[in-house]
Swiss-Prot record:
InterPro entries: EmrB-like (IPR004638), MFS (IPR011701), MFS_dom (IPR020846), MFS_trans_sf (IPR036259). It is a multi-pass membrane protein. One of its GO terms (biological process) is response to antibiotic. The lineage of its organism: Bacteria, Bacillati, Bacillota, Bacilli, Bacillales. This is Lincomycin resistance protein LmrB. Proton-dependent transporter. May mediate the efflux of lincomycin. It comes from Bacillus subtilis (strain 168). GO terms for molecular function: transmembrane transporter activity. GO terms for cellular component: membrane; plasma membrane. It is found in: Cell membrane.
C-alpha cells in the first residue's frame, strides 16, 4: 500500500495522516476552482455583467497563481510545512466564505483572488512534500494518488454545480465546500508534520518584482487575448506580453547570476527534467483547452443543458482519476517511456476524432472519446512529471516543483487563449460562407466548425509531445 509509513534516514514520517491532509485540502481546492465555471452564465444574468467581465473570475484566479507559484520555492525554504499548510487553508476558507456571501461581482472577484492565494501555496507544497517523504521507488504511486485528486475533483465539479444550480443557486457551491475545508484544516493542524528544511535564504526583492512582472504579464496577456475583447491585436494584450517576456528574460538572467537565486534555473541542466517540463506543459495545454472547448461544443453545438454536459464529461474524468494511481504503479515498475508514448498516441488519435465532430454527433460518442482522452492524459501527466523531478538533487526539489507548477499555469493560459482564438476564427470563416447568417440554426454549426479548428491545433501540439516522448529515459536515482 502506497500510504504506508516510509522513513528518511534521520526521521520517521507518518505518511498516512500527511497524505490525507494534503489530499483533502487539494480535492476541495480543485473542486472549488472548476465548479464555478458552469455557473458563469447564471452569474452574468444575476449580476448583470458581460462575458468579458465574468471571465475575470477565471483570469484573476490564474493571474494570482501565475504570480504566487514562482515565489513558492522561496516560501518552502522560509516557512515550515505546517505553517504553509495552515496559511493556505485559512486563505481558502476565507475566500470561500466571502464568495458564499458575495452580494456583488466585486466581492466575488475579491473572494476568488483570496482563494487563489490558498491554492497557489498548496499546490507546490503537495508535490514538494511527496518528494521528501517518499523514496524514489514509491514516488510514482504517490504522485498517482495526488493525480487521482487533481483529476477527480474537476471531473465532478461541473456535474455537481449543474445539480446545485437546478435546485439552489451559485452561492451554495461555496457553502457546500466550506465545511470540508474546515475539516481539512483541523485534520492538518492535528497531524501535519514539518518535512522540509527551512534554510531561510536571502530574499532578493528585485527577483520577486521581475518574477511578478514576467509571469504575471504573460498570464494576463494570454488570458485577455482569449476573452475576445480586441483579441491578439488589443494594445493591452500586446503590451502585457511584451512586458511579460522582457520581465521573464531579466528574471532568468538575474537567477543565473546569483549565488542564492529565488528560483534556481540550474535545474534545467538536467535533461530529463527539461523533457518532463515540456511533456507536462503540452499535456496541460491539451487538457485545459479541451476542458474549455467540450462544454461549449456540448451546450452550443449539440444543444445540451449544463447539467447534461457535465454528465457527459463525468465518466472520463472519474476514470482519469482512478487511472492515475494505476499509471503511478506502472511507472514505478516499468519507467516513463512505455506509458508516455502510448499515452500521446491515444491523445493524438482522439483529438483527430474531435476535430471531425458535427452537430449530429451523439453524446455516447463524445463520452467514449473523452474517456479515451482522459486515459491517455493519465498515462502522460504524472509519469513525465515524476521522472523529471526524480533527476533533481534534493536541494533542487523546491525549485523543481515551483518551475513545474508555474509552467502549468502558463500552459493553461496559453492553451485556452490560443484555442479560443482559433475557435472564434473558425466560427467567423464558417459564417462568411453562409447565405443567411441570421438563421438561428446556423449558430450551432458555426460553433462546431470553430471547435473543429481548435481541436486541430490541440492535435498538432499532441504530435509534438509524441515526438518528444521517444527521447524519454528512466532516471536512475542515486541521491
Amino acid at each position: 500500500m502506497i500510504l504506508e509509513t516510509t522513513a528518511k534516514a534521520s526521521q520517521q514520517y507518518k505518511v498516512m495522516p500527511i497524505m490525507i491532509s494534503l489530499l483533502l485540502a487539494g480535492f476541495i481546492g480543485m473542486f472549488s476552482e472548476t465548479a464555478l465555471n458552469i455557473a458563469l452564465t447564471d452569474l452574468m444574468k444575476e449580476l448583470n455583467i458581460t462575458a468579458a467581465t465574468v471571465q475575470w473570475l477565471t483570469t484573476g484566479y490564474l493571474l494570482v497563481l501565475g504570480i504566487l507559484v514562482p515565489v513558492s520555492g522561496l516560501l518552502l525554504q522560509w516557512f515550515t510545512t505546517r505553517q504553509l499548510f495552515t496559511v493556505s487553508l485559512i486563505f481558502s476558507i476565507l475566500g470561500t466564505f466571502i464568495a458564499a456571501l458575495a452580494p456583488s461581482f466585486s466581492f466575488l472577484l475579491a473572494a476568488r483572488i483570496v482563494q487563489a492565494l490558498g491554492t497557489g501555496l498548496l499546490l507546490p507544497l503537495m508535490f514538494n512534500t511527496i518528494l521528501v517523504i517518499f523514496p524514489p521507488h514509491k514516488r510514482g504511486a504517490a504522485m498517482g494518488t495526488i493525480g487521482l485528486v487533481i483529476m477527480f475533483a474537476p471531473a465532478i465539479g461541473p456535474t455537481f454545480s449543474g445539480l446545485v444550480l437546478e435546485h439552489l443557486n451559485w452561492h451554495w457551491i461555496f457553502w457546500i465546500s466550506l465545511p470540508f475545508l474546515v475539516l481539512a484544516l483541523v485534520f492538518g493542524i492535528a497531524y501535519m508534520q514539518n518535512v522540509s528544511e527551512t534554510t531561510k535564504p536571502k530574499i532578493d526583492v528585485l527577483s520577486i518584482i521581475l518574477s511578478t512582472i514576467g509571469f504575471g504579464g504573460i498570464v494576463f496577456g494570454f488570458s485577455n487575448a482569449g476573452e475576445g475583447s480586441g483579441g491578439w491585436s488589443s494594445p493591452t494584450v500586446i503590451v502585457s506580453l511584451i512586458v511579460g517576456v522582457v520581465g521573464l528574460i531579466l528574471f532568468s538572467i538575474r537567477q543565473l547570476t546569483m549565488k542564492q537565486p529565488m528560483m534556481n534555473l540550474r535545474a534545467f541542466k538536467y535533461p530529463m527534467f527539461i523533457l518532463g517540463v515540456i511533456m507536462v506543459f503540452i499535456c496541460m495545454m491539451v487538457i485545459l483547452s479541451s476542458m474549455l472547448l467540450l462544454p461549449m461544443y456540448l451546450q452550443g453545438g449539440l444543444v445540451l443543458t449544463a447539467f447534461a454536459s457535465g454528465l457527459v464529461l463525468l465518466p472520463g474524468g472519474i476514470l482519469n482519476g482512478f487511472m492515475s494511481p494505476v499509471t503511478g504503479r506502472l511507472f514505478d515498475k516499468y519507467g516513463p517511456k512505455w506509458l508516455v508514448i502510448p499515452g500521446f498516441v491515444i491523445v493524438t488519435v482522439v483529438l483527430w476524432f474531435f476535430s471531425n465532430v458535427t452537430t449530429t454527433s451523439t453524446a455516447v460518442l463524445i463520452i467514449i472519446l473523452h474517456t479515451c482522452l482522459m486515459i491517455g492524459i493519465s498515462m502522460i501527466m504524472m509519469p513525465a512529471q515524476t521522472n523529471g523531478l526524480n533527476q533533481l538533487p534534493r536541494e533542487f526539489y523546491p525549485d523543481g516543483t515551483a518551475i513545474m507548477n508555474t509552467l502549468q499555469q502558463m500552459a493553461g493560459a496559453i492553451g485556452t487563449a490560443v484555442a479560443v482564438s482559433i475557435m472564434a476564427a473558425g466560427q467567423h470563416d464558417y459564417m462568411s460562407t453562409v447565405k443567411n447568417p441570421a438563421d438561428p440554426a446556423v449558430i450551432p454549426q458555426a460553433l462546431t466548425a470553430g471547435v473543429q479548428h481548435a481541436f486541430v491545433f490541440a492535435m498538432i501540439v499532441a504530435i509534438i509531445g509524441l515526438i518528444g516522448a521517444f527521447f524519454m529515459k528512466r532516471v536512475k536515482v542515486d541521491h
